[in-house]
From Swiss-Prot:
Substrate binds at residues 74, 99, 208. Gene3D superfamilies: 2.70.98.10. It comes from Escherichia coli (strain K12). Keywords: Isomerase. Belongs to the glucose-6-phosphate 1-epimerase family. GO terms for biological process: carbohydrate metabolic process; DNA damage response. GO terms for cellular component: cytoplasm; cytosol. GO terms for molecular function: carbohydrate binding; glucose-6-phosphate 1-epimerase activity. This is Putative glucose-6-phosphate 1-epimerase. It catalyses: alpha-D-glucose 6-phosphate = beta-D-glucose 6-phosphate.
Length: 294
């Protein structure tokens, strides 16, 4: 899917390294820079791919995901906002509406090290169908040898949220994650609280855990691709570790049956409590990613 994105015809050359393209129904922004290749969907301000020069793709994007208006994209970095997980009210979209609506590219800046982009979403008649509040939501990205994401929300309300990042791995059976802390809510086991005793999370089957006292950096150890991905978290309360395992993967129409084998989600989140936003104090949720050899 990522190769397909970079082979799409250019609709508009925004700058020497930025272009607008289209895949099915969705407008894309493609970054082709000497230090980095990356792509975004305007729907959801959704980072689809990020590949620093000389590295394998860092993010995972499903080959089966549709690129259709209002349909969530499977992979990359979905922005879950203004709620994380199932909605409190029946009939509302899981993980909020921000990932399903078109955003505006507000600014971009390029230099020798990479590209910075800011996307914006504000209240509209469409958002008021889901949520009564006025808001401005900004998604700041800096892509180069590292990837930095900052979700900034303005208004008067409370939210839960996550940067639901899908990381590309060689083989989930040879992946471990450290730096998650010990206490977690096990969503596969009736949301019971449990403890990770050895500090190392592996993924032998379906895994869905909300860690309650994570460290500021989670480390993905990928034996098959012989690399380490360091995931920094800022302004967060939780880190979520997720992989659907074989049975759920088969049931998901937007994922290959064996899709679970080649990704792991390590998510920067504010999920177990609400985050308060005031006019005097905007809220942030931020993630930074870097890659190194094992």
């Amino acid at each position: 899917m990522i190769k397909k994105i970079f082979a799409l015809p250019v609709i508009e050359q925004i700058s020497p390294v930025l272009s607008r393209r289209k895949l099915d129904e969705l407008d894309l922004i493609v970054v082709d820079h000497p230090q980095v290749k990356a792509s975004f969907a305007l729907q959801g301000a959704h980072l689809l791919s990020w590949k620093p020069a000389g590295e394998e793709e860092v993010l995972w994007l499903s080959n089966n995901t549709p690129f259709k208006n209002g349909v969530a994209i499977r992979g990359g970095v979905p922005v879950c906002w203004p709620w994380f997980g199932p909605a409190a009210q029946q009939g509302l979209p899981a993980h909020g509406f921000a990932r399903n609506l078109p955003w505006t590219l507000k600014s971009h800046h390029e230099d020798a090290d990479g590209v910075a982009l800011t996307f914006e979403l504000t209240q509209s008649e469409e958002t008021k169908k889901f949520w009564p509040h006025d808001f401005t939501l900004l998604a700041h990205f800096r892509v180069g040898k590292t990837c930095e994401i900052d979700l900034e929300s303005h208004g008067e309300f409370e939210t839960t949220s996550a940067l639901h990042t899908y990381f590309n791995v060689g083989d989930i059976a040879k992946v471990s994650v450290s730096g998650l802390g010990d206490r977690f809510i096990d969503k596969v086991n009736d949301a019971k609280e449990n403890v990770l005793t050895d500090g190392i999370q592996t993924f032998p089957d379906r895994t869905d855990r909300v860690y309650l006292n994570p460290q500021d950096c989670s480390v993905i150890n990928d034996e098959a691709l012989n690399r380490i991905i360091a995931v920094g978290h800022q302004h967060h309360l939780n880190v979520v570790g997720w992989n659907p395992g074989p049975a759920l993967s088969i049931s998901m129409g937007d994922m290959p049956d064996d899709g679970y084998k080649t990704f792991v989600c390590v998510e920067t989140a504010y999920a177990s409590e609400t985050q308060k936003v005031t006019k005097e104090k905007p809220a942030h949720l931020a993630q930074s990613i870097r890659v190194a050899k094992r």
